[in-house]
Amino acid sequence: MSAGIVQLIAIGAQDEYIVGNPEISFFSSTFKRHANFSQSIEKQTIHGAVKNNSMSSVQFERSGDLLSYVYFTLDDTTKSLDIQRWDTIIDKVELYIGGSLVDSQDALFTEKIAIDTFAQNVSKSANGTHPGVSARSYFYPLRFFFCEGPQCALPLVALNYHNVEIRIHWATAASDYNVECFANYYYLDNEERGNIATRKHDLLITQVQKNIGSRTIVQDLTFNHPVKYLASSDTTTDGALTSPSNKIKLNINGLDVSNFRWGKPHYIDVMSYYHTNFVTSPDFFLYCFCLSTSSLQPTGTLNFSRLDSAKIMSETMPINDPIYAVNYNILRIENGMAGLLYAN
């Protein structure tokens, strides 16, 4: 009798919980047919000269039915260029739909925080092709909600009366390069296009809020909406929220969520270990109300709109760096127009 047969027949009562009434087999597979679609990356027109400390805009063309990821590249007209500090090119990017501000993300958030907290795979992590501030990169990806996956794509075909626009605030070295913007579009078959164009959409989206550092030992958190997590852009080892020799705590409505704890490891290593997916070298303050920072599916929030007060308290060192909050909101698209369901 072969060893394989011996293992196969060595079954007891406990095995009923594992292999009794099997529901799957590892030796067959099934698949689902998907709706027909295509996709295309198309260059966008940047309106306004790219100059240091100035602003330009991109109004997305209605080339396709859905708008997906958007990114910027650099070149000197003879070859493409890579750079480590994209925050010297781009200060922040704002998203407008129908002339109303929907989200704003600065380069500190994109390059230092989102690179870790948004990563759903290695390719989008600090070990991927855009590693954030840790290494050089040939492109700068925007991290607005519609850029994070096909299920989040923005249905342009349902926005007959509202344009989608980004406004780019350039940083101090933008004039040194030729900057180009590209967007990925999805194209749908007639039936699915008609369905998306005519029905009402309540899109679950993420937004980014920012509080400037207080430069004192108490940081008031003036945020709104259900917040997934808090994070700071400080990636040094001697900041108030990152130092292994300073203690911090969170206070909500006058009640301490915890006693004072060392910033490192409690709010750096531990939070990244349990609540992120692809962080190998955590280096910034992170406080999670969610189970997973990278999941669009809600896994826990704290509704800051319902709080009287929220503070981060430092034991000895002043908090000098910005604090960011990533929150959920609903973008309603109906009758060819879009608007946020909940305002600040």
Regions found by a protein language model. Give the residues of each.
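Short, low-complexity Pro/Thr/Gly
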Residues: 1-344
